[in-house]
Amino acid sequence: DGKDLAGKNNAEVSQMLRGQAGTSFKLKVNRPNAKGGNTPMEFTIVRESIQNPAIPYAAVLDNQVGYINLSTFSGNPSKEFKKAFLDLKKQGATSLVIDLRGNGGGLLDEAVEIANYFLPRGKIKQASNTYKTLREPLDLDIPIAVLVNSGTASASEILSGSLQDLDRAVIVGSRTFGKGLVQVPRSLPYGGTMKVTTSKYYIPSGRCVQAID
């Protein structure tokens, strides 16, 4: 749109290209040609909403080990997970690694839904509410290992902790983040906002996943 991008860094260029989905901008580039010069070219780019997949990678590794990298619990990752898992089983996977490293959480219901795939009908607790695994599981016997690290938080800790507490998976990695509280924003006078802790997450053994300073 007539703005020069020369000399700008990636963050500055990215900021200039962002906009509402459905809007467009003109991008003019100089493409090197066979004569040693540049050929100016102009493109009209239409912006679209970008949604990163909840499962950026899934594959059958050596020794028939299925691997699923689950990056978020936002959106509808349980459907993506189910499809990926069933595809791995068709490819011959006899064990499963669920990679939750760097997964900061998302929707608790999605974590319960994925736990449902590997647990008999039971309970996962959250404060005074009870979340039940209601559907028939996909596989009660496949060996599972869950990878975690300091970036594993919230719904990720609920899933990994529940699978561990119910003797359904082995947890491998470092200490997780410890995000076990629920905050609700409250409006304050003069436009301020305060987050108030209203509840805690508990996994089946009764442990709260919140870190203690």
Predicted regions and their residues:
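Short acidic, Pro/Gly- and aromatic-enriched capping/linker segments at domain boundaries
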Residues: 190-199
